[in-house]
Amino acid sequence: MPTRRRVALLTLLTAGTLVAREAQRNATHSDPAARAAAVRRKVAVATWAAPTEGRLMTRIVVDADPVLDYVARRRAEGAKGLTPMHVLGAAAGRALRVVPEANTRVRAGRPVSFDDVAVGFAVDIGQGTDLAPVKVVGADVLTPAQIATRVWTGVTALRDGTDPGFSRTTRVAALVPALAMKPLLKASDLVLGALGRPLLGQVGNPLGAVFISNVAPLGVEEVFLAPVPFARAAVYISQGTITERAVVRDGAVVAVRQFTLCLTGDHRLVDGVQCAIFFDALVGLLKDPDRLG
């Protein structure tokens, strides 16, 4: 048998063996939550390496009462499922209009603008055991209530297993051998991130230009999110738990309900001044959320 055929046959046999072993390893996890956690960990190991890109990281404390009052009023008017996270998403969409440099990704070594303004949300689909993104396009014009409706529609499909894209991605990730995961994610970086095209069930640029994660249900006040390379989102924001804090106002110490926002920005796209302008626009809208509709 010619050498090339032997190498090709050996490669196919090796790949088949690795896939079979991966399937057998997955089968040992009888608990669906354990299987999901194993897949997520495998993807995480293949996604990140030692950091090589510049990141800007900052935090800001926001008064919660204006947002909470707005949410309470809108829910009383019929805005089902509206939460502060959706208000934050609408504010982030408007802030992208103020700082258009943040609504870009790096492609072929240069910044390229997105065709739309999209914000992604991390949502819990496994009672704390699994997360998935829901991308909302048009976040710069949608009201918080409209964003809430779209997010909950996505959450329902993900939790019910009726989202075909996520199901396909999970199946592929479960079967791909660990050694092949990094090359697969490299391809995802090109197709999903740079070109913005769908791949293996994922939509292009699946996290949007800004990705938001509400860590409050975990009882966490602040955390800086780790950027996902293949998503190529420019800004990541975490929203911490709402707590009463002692604040000096007009020379007196008062108790104020507040939460912390932590921002991680891609320094290739935004600098310190632009992050400050973005945060200023964001916080201004959170202080007066009625401007969001």
Language-model features and meaning:
Residues 2-293:
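C-terminal catalytic/motor cores of large multi-domain enzyme assemblies
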